[in-house]
């Protein structure tokens, strides 16, 4: 049986639950290899099964490593589970309330994070796919001819997305951020129909065989922008150097945040230091002051400190880190990119 399923069955046994219900698309994909396009109910038990939408049956049969059955109705699905003697059901915490109410009258139910804990630790194959996604994204970034084509932010974002697909990506792993000038102080700025200003901040990633990458680079122009860039780079580098198994995620956030505080910009670092990624662009754990998760080998987490000066500009620098005995940066794109 698949190791992921086997581990969850052990969790179920330890907690005296008989089955585990998943509906989140990437959770179903993680367990079975099949990513739903409509809806699906994955029930992990001794004989795991997926109830898939009729529109998805051809895809599900092709991709799934576990049994697939066409979904008929909640009543049919519940009756089949009850006939197997299932009386209690663990559910993923993200299960929609509208789905929960369909099951609550027939089963004892509790939310469990079994799948989240499984997905925290990447296999060598998963890390290889994240690495390939990163290589595609970084190669595409270097192929951009930003300053010579007089493009707008939206056009540069489009070109980067196109290059990633041409280089082997399925698509971008999130809405590509290309922002410049004062708008770069917005961490989630939306590319606009305007010619690029200084500085230029680009946050982008690719998907390869389902797995995401994530990088950010900021290209600066003025002396003040360079001063802020240097502070963020110091925070980025020292946070990565501090990462090792056994520490808490919050410890790394503190390292990054303390560097920025040393220069009196602590109020301008307005988000966490990093997040895990994999099949989803944002997974757990993350480098934040509130995350007490212990760092383990096999985790893949971004480091992305930033300083945002409202009305002036922002600087963010981001790399993805694979954790072994130490922190290994995935990819080889230089932190410093000179366009000006």
Residue ranges and their predicted role:
Residues 1-340:
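Active-site neighborhoods and metal-handling regions in enzymes and metal-associated proteins
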């Amino acid at each position: 049986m698949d190791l992921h399923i086997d581990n969850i069955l052990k969790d179920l046994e330890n907690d005296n639950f008989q089955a585990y219900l998943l509906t989140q698309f990437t959770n179903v994909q993680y367990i079975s290899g099949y990513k739903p396009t409509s809806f699906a109910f994955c029930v992990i038990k001794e004989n795991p099964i997926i109830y898939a939408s009729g529109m998805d049956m051809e895809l599900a049969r092709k991709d799934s490593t576990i049994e697939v059955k066409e979904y008929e109705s909640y009543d049919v699905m519940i009756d089949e589970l009850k006939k197997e003697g299932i009386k209690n059901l663990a559910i993923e915490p993200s299960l929609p309330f509208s789905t929960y109410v369909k099951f609550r009258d027939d089963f004892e139910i509790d939310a469990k994070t079994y799948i989240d804990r499984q997905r925290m630790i990447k296999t060598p194959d998963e890390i290889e796919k994240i690495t390939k996604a990163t290589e595609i994204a970084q190669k595409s970034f270097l192929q951009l001819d930003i300053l010579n084509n007089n493009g707008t932010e939206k056009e540069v974002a489009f070109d980067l997305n196109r290059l990633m697909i041409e280089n082997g990506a399925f698509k971008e792993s999130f809405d590509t951020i290309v922002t410049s000038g004062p708008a770069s102080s917005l961490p989630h700025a939306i590319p606009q129909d305007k010619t690029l200003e200084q500085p230029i901040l680009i946050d982008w990633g690719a998907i390869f065989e389902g797995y995401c990458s994530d990088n950010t680079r900021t290209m600066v122009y003025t002396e003040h922008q360079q001063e802020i860039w240097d502070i963020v780079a110091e925070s980025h580098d020292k946070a990565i150097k501090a990462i090792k198994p056994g520490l808490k995620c919050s410890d790394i956030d503190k390292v990054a945040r303390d560097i920025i505080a040393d220069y009196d910009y602590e109020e301008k670092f307005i988000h966490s230091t990093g997040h895990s990624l994999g099949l989803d662009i944002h997974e757990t754990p993350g480098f934040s002051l509130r995350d007490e998760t212990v760092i383990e080998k096999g985790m893949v987490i971004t480091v992305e400190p930033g300083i945002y000066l409202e009305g002036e500009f922002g600087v963010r620098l981001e790399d993805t880190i694979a954790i072994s005995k130490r922190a290994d940066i995935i990819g080889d794109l230089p932190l410093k990119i000179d366009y000006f």
